[in-house]
Amino acid sequence: MPHRLRALSLLLTASIATIGLGPAHAGDTVATYLERIRTIDQSGPTLHAVLAVNPDAAKEELAARAIKGPLAGKVILVKDNIEVAGPLPTTAGSWALHGNVTGRDAPLIARLRKAGVVILGKTNLSEWANMRSGSSSSGWSGVGGQTRNPHALDRSPCGSSSGSGAGVAAGLAWAAIGTETDGSVTCPASANGIVGFKPTLGLVSRTHVVPLSHSQDTPGPMATSVADAALLLNGMAGSDPLDPATLEADKLKTDFTAGLATASLKGVRIGVLRKQAGTEPKVQALFDKALADLKAGGAELVEIDYTFPADLGRDELTVLLFDLREDMGTYLRGLPGNPPLRSLADLIAFNKAHADLELHWFGQDLFESAEKTTDRAAYEKARANSLRLAGVEGIDKLLATNKVSFLVAPTSGPAWPIDLVTGDHDGSGVGAGTLAAVAGYPHLSVPMGAVEGLPIGLSIIGAKWDDAHVLQAGAAYERARTVAVPVPSLKRWGD
């Protein structure tokens, strides 16, 4: 273990020990979660979901008792690319930011604190939100090592919000916050058997969140039920003058928990993206059970023959690479003090100089490609084309032409074996989340069962700013669901 990683591990251990020694009435809930972190995250199954805990969590829990409201006292974990005031750094999983203690809350965190939410700690993630290399292992970071899937310890937790997904599934907090550029909330939710919601881009602030792409980035809630995810979203959503994308958020947000308990599928027309269910018979069979439950709940199902446009993936990558170079530099230069790393080029140089910490398992080919992606005209053309393909000619057209309110497909295939040597092996061809990611539209993943003990989620995708109705559809599906949701085994697959 590198000496700096050992130091962070000691910080985590010391923080847990200090909080755990408090009086019985101080932070009872926090203490319960910390005991679970100690016994199944640090030792035993060693999930490696939590990077560090907040040493003031018990005090925050006590203070929250004076706050009235449904979020007061709720204990959450936060993905470690989101800034949280206090002693913990925001690293994005990289040793390049191991000293990035900014002393400030991201606006979305400030909103949650005002509502009485207790920040328990920071979660591991796919380093740089899975945008450093095309050969990466989801859930691995230089700082945090490899996060494990609590349903099958040798299987991927998906990413990049790996620790948030695994942590919620393992009961290490009431809920967690993840971030998504394309699949980074919904895929870990699916793989870990929990609910994950990627809201409409612009509903939640991205200020003081380590960026990949302002075109697609958004934080989102991860929880064990749609109701809990909606409640957490209530505290997260809102306008931020520092994030122009959120200009309309205060006017368009609502109480996302309203109507969940009585939401019905009766008469709701739902588009079925059959091709996006892949070719694996067991995944298709599980999807068919979910469709049967939707139909039994009163939904009208409309089969849709849709194929992803060949240009969409290419244009999306062009956008992400260009944004990465620009947005990362802006973030680094905006850090308090005199940050030593001020550009993507600086990060590339850091990784080369610290290859023993960062480059042992995979390289930085995406970083290097992004550094060379400087053609703004090509970027603007790719952005316009990808928005057209995913939005106007994608989700918008599919909803309107077929007269449906939502689109459904499996979120992902079963979790694949962790492979640090050659990287992720998700060749399932399952999922439609890229449409929602590129268009910036809402996408909910709700557990729909498991294949051989490996959870799979049902994706529900809706129109822009139709977040509340997407959540209502998810809650109605939860009630209609007849398939058992798997419980984490905390064992290797097949044991």
Predicted ranges, named:
Residues L34-T46, P55-A58, L62-A66, R113-K114, ...:
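Sec-exported extracytoplasmic/periplasmic mature domains
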